[in-house]
């Protein structure tokens, strides 16, 4: 039922309603007792309305016919608006029963007309929640003849909490719960005895919290009981909401101030923003334009009504035009309407009516709470498929009925940039960008411009931190340094020019002109006359204001004086009285004390205001150890925000290499908001206001709140595990670095340095960082990343003063024993039982004109002699001349004794190249050909660096007396290497080769035998691939050789002895014959092609002649040949080989060399560096292809690398490649940045149990830290992954089937060959191999990490292996194990 309905009774499910069988009326009998309150005189008469109680739990109510009242009955009875209140701890007394009116009441009420009654259940109340619930004033409309007899009581909705309004103010009602709170707004009755209650008995309930409010409780009479003389009229029970439209005439009559938007005037009372409170504090408003975002509501202000706009007149219909609603009495359980004369059942203490006992027993008194959609407010309690989402970066989750509501809510929370801050101005009503938000009286007013802001301020009579001349807003009280005291009032200005203009114009601000039209009848501020007379501060003489001399007074404000002499005399008098005055013990201002506090030591402290008392108490509790009192110090620090002086431990803010100090945490927070000190929070990764900066393992981490700091600490501690400790010296959370036991207590430290410093402090050997004295250091603070210790708070404050203004007396160190004794004496005096009063400090002298402090210095300190070197002789300066004298060596040169004035010869060595003959041993059969070969080599001049290096090696010939076959020097220019005869033995194909030679097959092509049955990589499936490299490389153009001759017949393929043992899992059987045959094909093509094109970096005037037999070449020759081979090799049809095919051919060449007992490794040895560089350039251009089944196509497989010993633990480089391959395959590290993030501290061994076989297996775990940040590259998607605390965990499980290829065994071998001090480091994983290490060496690696270029070359080759792209590879291996 709407609250504006007249003549009706509104009852909810919590309203006790007893309908008697003979009278259908609501009893007001003993209202006070029914809610466990005191008996009200209005209703507690002797037994006039008292009824007998029935002890039955369930009551039976009979419903009788009801007739509507006649609409034309006049009103004669007196009416009053009465308020009933009840306490919070009310309990229900008595039982509900059927109501039987007394005989006296029946006689007096005979013939009265019954009223229409509507009884709504709780569902009706919930359906009306969308209607307007907030009304500020309830004024009952009455006939003119009863106007003077009506008492108006205002009920403000501001006293209700938001939750309670939503819960209970949809339809007002009465509750019978024991802990409920009731407010009866209007109780209207036709009984004559009720109207005679005095007004003094009414209680005002404004400002009290309550759950429910009853707008009307009406006593209705029955038609059978007699007629009431004056009857009933609907207007007597109506509630009319009146609004006031301000006009010029109304303001003139009531004496209201100037134009005031948002005010309402009713019956002469001034209402501001919907409330009737007056302006107690002139600074009670807050401007949010500087500290709060414009589109965000100020925290802590929770008003029930929206932003007030200019009032508009609302048409109020008359009482006779308001319709009434029909009768609707339904069962609370089955919702069936109750017929006339039907028996109704009611439970004791409940307001619900039921049609039967079945409904009465099955009805639940407290229904389950309903869930509403956040956006559309739809009931979603029983709805399926609701959406729960976390929106607007909040910690709570919201529930929506559909995705459309979610989208609308997100759009509402995140509006577009253009309409981000557009709202309607309170003054002008324009929908535009808001510049100011003023919170006043629990109402937030939005103002679009400074013009509207000044109009609002002047209209409401608010005092603010604005310039008195131009009206410019000052962010804080300390921002306006230009202050004038005129007639005892302080006036602030933004600059000195405004001060001058204010003096000239005569104290009339210029911005008042904007609101002059609205200030016609205002008495708040009248313009003053030009040249106003002002009283001199010294002699109290009246002088013109602009002739006065201004000077800063002892309180820090500008004071006017008539002359300079008067100013000096007043200062002299004030200086004498100041020493005898009372000074505030906190801010040190000389003012009249408002508060006095007796401290535990018996001293009486004076304070100027309550703010100083609160700050002094808070800071004393923080700085006092174990609750002991600490006497205030004479040293004063200045807060960087409020500019007040204080003598306690300051709050420190380190920002942009500057340290700011504040008197309290509040000033520090306000300073951060005012100066926009924002940073990215280390935990939530959002740009917010800086809360605190904490060190973690020596790294400063900023946080936006205390919650983010605690959550980051938990993640950090969980990541380090048992190694995470808190350093006892620097108090940072870090990994355990040192441990020290002191007096039976084991203490942990981050480093040995902290351990040593803590030990010095513990044994009182450390010195104070201020006075440099040893002893007990009670205070400590972290200053610019270092811990500072001090004797007490006095030294701490002196240290902070030295940072702003250096003090020469504190820089002398511990040698100043007299100063140390003085410090100890002063401390002893302070702790005595009867401390003497401290001497009056010297008066601080300042220059009047420029306000600079005089610098006092000792002259002798800066006078030091200037030392100069001067020769004693008068002759010219002797210059020493050096004459070289060549003397052959070895010759004995006698050196005589000499004096300092004589010249003596000094021997100096000068190296001179001398040719020395060297005899080279050679076999007898080739000694005759050596001179001819040497002459031929000397005649060759090469411009290529590689060829020059190869030609210089021919001067050294190895001896091999057991050789039976002569090497043809003309066919091969280079025969030997530095190693000597060992390589010559390896190059003999007849004596050392264990693999049969491969016959040349010109048409043998690997890409024809193993075609690429795959789709071309396009834009549609490119996103399926992981990132291959950290950067993109352009494919270098390679020359094409000419096609020669017709196709030859295909020869049957030759298979090696290892082909039968190929792994069945490989897609392509590995055959080294493809590589050897490609080499022979390239050598033949190179010899026949006279126009061979080579790369610019490998060009030479005379190239090395190569042979088809690979075993006949030395290391240098193979390096040169393979470098050209990978760039010039072509398929038999003349097309280019794919990069994976070239890598496959090189692997075949390596297997052929290993099978022939050749110990060269073309992929690892330093002698093949040129070939490795050229091969890496080719492999960078490889792009994988996708097969129809979604897998990646590549001709290189993992089994090939194990067969040719590229993977394994037989050498340091091979072990390093194996770890790199396993990390790429199982950890899913596809970029160099991801490999560099690995460290010994993030990879650890772990035991895992198989849930099927219950067998424990060792595994390596790598937990990717969420604190590393997100890379620009794609996220890791491959590998075994587990979710623990939302952090990806990757594992490498032990391979029990083949221990030689087990990743856990390889990692353990790598740890055993690494230095022991690197096992726990967090910044290195891949180590540089030791150059001089052998296979039997205990340590293979150094402590230096591999460079980025080496890791990138390793990654290029690993990414060509097909097995790393198989997602199910590791899971299958795990199951088979």
UniProtKB/Swiss-Prot annotation:
Its main location: nucleus. There is a cross-link at residues 48, 88, 98, 104, 147, 253, 297, 312, 325, 348, 366, 417, 441, 491, 503, 513, 529, 532, 576, 603, 649, 658, 688, 700, 709, 764, 788, 812, 829 (Glycyl lysine isopeptide (Lys-Gly) (interchain with G-Cter in SUMO2)). GO terms for molecular function: zinc ion binding. It is found in: Nucleus. A zinc finger (MYM-type) spans 327-363, 369-409, 421-456, 463-502, 533-570, 636-671, 723-758, 764-799. The modification Phosphoserine is found at residues 159, 305, 838, 958, 1064. May function as a transcription factor. This is Zinc finger MYM-type protein 2.
């Amino acid at each position: 039922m709407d609250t504006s309905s007249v003549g009706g009774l509104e009852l909810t499910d919590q309203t006790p309603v007893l309908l008697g069988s003979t009278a259908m009326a609501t009893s007001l009998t003993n209202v006070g007792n029914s809610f466990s309150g005191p008996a009200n005189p209005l209703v507690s008469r002797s037994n006039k309305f008292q009824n007998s109680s029935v002890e039955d739990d369930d009551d039976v109510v009979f419903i009788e016919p009801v007739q509507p009242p006649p609409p034309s009955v006049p009103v004669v009875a007196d009416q009053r608006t009465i308020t009933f209140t009840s306490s919070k701890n009310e309990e229900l007394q008595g039982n509900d029963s059927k109501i039987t009116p007394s005989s006296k009441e029946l006689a007096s009420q005979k013939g009265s007309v019954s009223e229409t009654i509507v009884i709504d259940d709780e569902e009706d109340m919930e359906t009306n929640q969308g209607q307007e619930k907030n009304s500020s004033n309830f004024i009952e409309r009455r006939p003119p003849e009863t106007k003077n007899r009506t008492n108006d009581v205002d009920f403000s909705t501001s006293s209700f909490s938001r939750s309670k309004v939503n819960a209970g103010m949809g339809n007002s009602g009465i509750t019978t719960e024991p802990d409920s709170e009731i407010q009866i707004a209007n109780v209207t009755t036709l009984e004559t005895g009720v109207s005679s209650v005095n007004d003094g008995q009414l209680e005002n309930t404004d400002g009290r919290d309550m759950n429910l409010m009853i707008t009307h409780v009406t006593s209705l009479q029955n038609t059978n009981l007699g007629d009431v003389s004056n009857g009933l009229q609907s207007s007597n029970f109506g509630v009319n909401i009146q609004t006031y439209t301000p006009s010029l005439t109304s303001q003139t009559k009531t004496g209201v101030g100037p134009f005031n938007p948002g005010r309402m005037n009713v019956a002469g009372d001034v209402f501001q923003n919907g409330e009737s409170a007056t302006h107690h504090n002139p600074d009670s408003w807050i401007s949010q334009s500087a500290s709060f975002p414009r589109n965000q509501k100020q925290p802590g202000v929770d008003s029930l009504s929206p932003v007030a706009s200019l009032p508009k007149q609302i048409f109020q219909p008359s009482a006779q035009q308001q319709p009434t609603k029909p009768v609707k009495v339904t069962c609370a359980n089955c919702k069936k309407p109750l017929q006339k004369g039907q028996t109704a059942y009611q439970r004791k203490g409940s307001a619900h009516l039921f049609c039967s006992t079945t409904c009465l027993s099955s009805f639940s008194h407290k229904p389950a709470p309903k869930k509403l959609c956040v956006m559309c407010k739809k009931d979603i309690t029983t709805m399926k498929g609701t959406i729960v989402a976390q929106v607007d970066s909040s910690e709570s989750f919201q529930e929506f009925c559909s995705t459309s509501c979610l989208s609308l809510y997100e759009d509402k929370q995140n509006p577009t940039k253009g309409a981000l801050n557009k709202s309607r101005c309170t003054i002008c009503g324009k929908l535009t960008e808001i510049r100011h938000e003023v919170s006043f009286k629990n109402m937030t007013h939005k103002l679009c411009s400074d013009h509207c802001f000044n109009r609002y301020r002047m209209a409401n009579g608010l005092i603010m931190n604005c310039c008195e001349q131009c009206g410019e807003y000052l962010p804080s009280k300390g921002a306006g340094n230009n202050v004038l005291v005129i007639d005892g009032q302080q006036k602030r200005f933004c600059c000195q020019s405004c001060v001058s203009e204010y003096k000239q114009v005569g104290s009339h601000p210029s911005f008042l002109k904007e609101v002059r039209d609205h200030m016609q009848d205002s008495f708040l501020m009248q313009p003053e006359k030009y040249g106003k007379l002002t009283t001199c501060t010294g002699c109290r003489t009246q002088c013109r204001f602009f002739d006065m001399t201004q000077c800063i007074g002892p309180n820090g404000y500008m004071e006017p004086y008539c002359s300079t002499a008067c100013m000096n005399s007043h200062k002299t008098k004030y200086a004498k009285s100041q020493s005898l005055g009372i000074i505030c013990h906190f801010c040190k201002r000389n003012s009249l004390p408002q508060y006095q506090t007796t401290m535990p030591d018996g001293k009486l402290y004076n304070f100027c205001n309550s703010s100083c008392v609160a700050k002094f108490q808070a800071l004393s509790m923080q700085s006092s150890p174990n609750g002991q009192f600490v006497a205030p110090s004479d040293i004063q620090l200045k807060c960087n925000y409020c500019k007040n002086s204080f003598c306690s431990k300051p709050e420190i803010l380190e920002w942009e290499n500057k340290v700011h100090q504040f008197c309290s945490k509040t000033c520090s927070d306000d300073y951060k908001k005012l100066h926009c000190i924002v940073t990215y929070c280390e935990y939530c990764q959002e740009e917010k206001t800086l809360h605190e900066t904490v060190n973690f393992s020596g790294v400063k981490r900023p946080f936006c709140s205390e919650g983010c700091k605690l959550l980051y600490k938990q993640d950090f501690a969980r990541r380090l595990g048992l190694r995470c400790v808190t350093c006892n010296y620097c108090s940072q959370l870090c990994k355990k670095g040192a441990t020290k036991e002191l007096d039976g207590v084991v203490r942990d430290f981050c480093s040995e340095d902290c351990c040593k410093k803590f030990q010095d402090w513990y044994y009182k050997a450390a010195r104070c960082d201020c006075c440099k004295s040893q002893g007990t250091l009670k205070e400590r603070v972290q200053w610019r990343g270092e811990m500072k210790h001090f004797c007490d708070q006095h030294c701490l404050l002196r240290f902070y003063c030295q940072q702003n203004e250096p003090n020469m007396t504190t820089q002398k160190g511990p040698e100043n024993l007299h100063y140390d004794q003085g410090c100890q004496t002063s401390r002893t005096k302070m702790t005595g039982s009867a401390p003497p009063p401290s001497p009056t400090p010297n008066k601080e002298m300042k220059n009047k004109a420029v306000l600079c402090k005089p610098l006092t210095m000792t002259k002798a300190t800066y006078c030091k002699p200037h030392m100069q070197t001067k020769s004693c002789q008068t002759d010219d300066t002797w210059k020493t001349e050096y004459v070289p004298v060549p003397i052959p060596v070895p010759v004995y040169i006698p050196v005589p004794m000499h004096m300092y004035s004589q010249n003596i010869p000094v021997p100096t060595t000068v190296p001179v190249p001398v040719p020395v003959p060297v005899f080279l041993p050679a076999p007898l059969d080739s000694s005759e050909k050596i001179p001819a070969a040497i002459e031929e080599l000397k005649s060759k001049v090469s411009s290529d660096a590689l060829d020059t290096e190869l030609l210089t090696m021919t001067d050294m010939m190895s001896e091999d007396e057991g050789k039976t076959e002569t090497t043809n020097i003309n066919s091969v220019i280079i025969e030997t290497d530095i190693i000597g005869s060992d390589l010559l033995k390896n190059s003999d194909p007849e004596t050392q080769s264990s693999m049969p030679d491969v016959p040349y097959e010109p048409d043998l092509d690997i890409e024809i035998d193993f075609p690429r049955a795959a789709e071309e990589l396009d834009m549609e499936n490119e996103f399926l691939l992981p990132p291959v490299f950290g950067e993109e490389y352009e494919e270098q153009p390679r020359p094409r050789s000419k096609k020669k001759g017709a196709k030859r017949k295909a020869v049957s393929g030759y298979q090696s002895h290892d082909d039968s043992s190929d792994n069945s899992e490989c897609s392509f059987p590995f055959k080294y014959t493809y590589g050897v045959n490609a080499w022979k094909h390239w050598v033949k093509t190179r010899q026949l092609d006279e126009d061979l094109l080579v790369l610019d970096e490998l060009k030479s005037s005379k190239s090395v002649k190569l042979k088809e037999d690979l075993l006949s070449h030395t290391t240098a020759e193979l390096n040169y040949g393979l470098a050209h081979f990978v760039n010039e090799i072509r398929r038999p049809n003349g097309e280019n080989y794919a990069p994976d095919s070239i890598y496959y051919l090189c692997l075949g060449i390596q297997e052929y060399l290993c099978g022939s007992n050749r110990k060269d490794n073309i992929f690892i040895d330093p002698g093949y560096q040129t070939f490795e560089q050229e091969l890496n350039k080719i492999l960078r251009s490889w792009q994988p292809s996708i097969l129809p089944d979604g897998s990646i196509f590549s001709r290189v497989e993992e089994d090939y690398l194990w067969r040719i010993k590229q993977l394994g633990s037989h050498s340091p480089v091979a072990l390093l490649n194996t770890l790199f391959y396993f990390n790429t395959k199982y950890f899913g590290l596809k970029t160099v940045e991801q490999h560099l993030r690995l460290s010994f501290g993030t990879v650890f061994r772990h035991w895992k149990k198989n849930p099927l076989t219950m067998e424990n297996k060792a595994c390596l775990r790598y937990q990717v830290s969420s604190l590393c940040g997100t890379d620009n590259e794609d996220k890791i998607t491959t590998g075994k992954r587990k979710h623990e605390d939302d952090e990806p965990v990757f594992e490498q499980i032990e391979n029990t089937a083949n221990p030689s290829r087990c990743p856990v065994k390889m990692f353990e071998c790598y740890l055993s060959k690494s230095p022991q001090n690197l096992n726990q480091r967090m910044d290195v994983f891949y180590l540089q191999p030791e150059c001089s290490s052998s296979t039997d060496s205990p340590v293979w690696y150094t402590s230096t990490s591999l460079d980025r270029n080496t890791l990138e070359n390793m990654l290029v080759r690993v990414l060509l292996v097909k097995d790393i792209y198989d997602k199910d590879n590791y899971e299958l291996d795990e199951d088979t194990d």
